[in-house]
């Protein structure tokens, strides 16, 4: 009985839409939804035969891999140095959290103005240096731009979790390793990084 409200919410907002999506994937309707024809797995067969689907799947995989790896690595480095900063730590952490507070639509407009081929400041600087940058015509430039924007937006979220994880590690372990002669690099890889594995797994998933 105590689980009844939670089960009702999950059934209403998860299982029911998922069931509808599954049923609709086995049907085919016109543009206005007036006539519905049961086609079974024909939609899936047409999907897997489409070459553009494989290309889009590969593109999504490359994008996800770059965003996950860069987002986690850069945010971990920033969190590590933020945990070591004593003077101006609050300002440093606040600046790194700001991107998380920016709405995605606003962030998209900002990146568009920065890298626009016609009016973008960064695009103009790159062209001045001899780099032809045009995310509208070059697929590699477009992928790089989207990855950079996604990583920038994700940094603050990952940074908060990594910083909290670093601050939760007992300082006695770090001090004991330092007394034993372990340097900062060795302390990080043998103590801090292994203890951050649950946080890293959570952010990666």
Where are these regions (language model features)?
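A structural signal for multi-pass alpha-helical bundles of membrane permease subunits
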Residues: 1-205
């Amino acid at each position: 009985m105590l689980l009844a409200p939670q089960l009702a919410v999950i059934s209403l907002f998860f299982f029911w839409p998922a069931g509808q999506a599954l049923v609709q994937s086995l049907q085919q309707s016109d543009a206005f939804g007036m006539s519905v024809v049961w086609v079974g797995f024909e939609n899936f067969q047409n999907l897997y035969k489409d070459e553009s689907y494989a290309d889009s799947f590969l593109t999504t995989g490359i994008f996800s891999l770059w965003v996950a790896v860069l987002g986690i690595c850069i945010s971990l480095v920033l969190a590590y140095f933020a945990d070591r900063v004593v003077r101006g730590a609050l300002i440093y952490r606040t600046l790194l959290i700001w991107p998380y507070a920016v709405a995605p639509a606003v962030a998209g407009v900002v990146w568009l103005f920065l890298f626009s081929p016609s009016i973008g400041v960064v695009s103009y600087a790159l062209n001045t240096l001899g780099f032809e940058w045009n995310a509208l015509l070059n697929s590699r430039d477009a992928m790089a731009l989207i990855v950079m924007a996604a990583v920038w937006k994700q940094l603050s979220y990952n940074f908060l979790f990594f910083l909290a994880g670093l601050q939760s590690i007992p300082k006695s372990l770090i001090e004991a390793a330092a007394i034993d002669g372990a340097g900062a690099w060795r302390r990080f890889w043998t103590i801090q990084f292994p203890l951050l594995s649950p946080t890293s797994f959570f952010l990666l998933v």
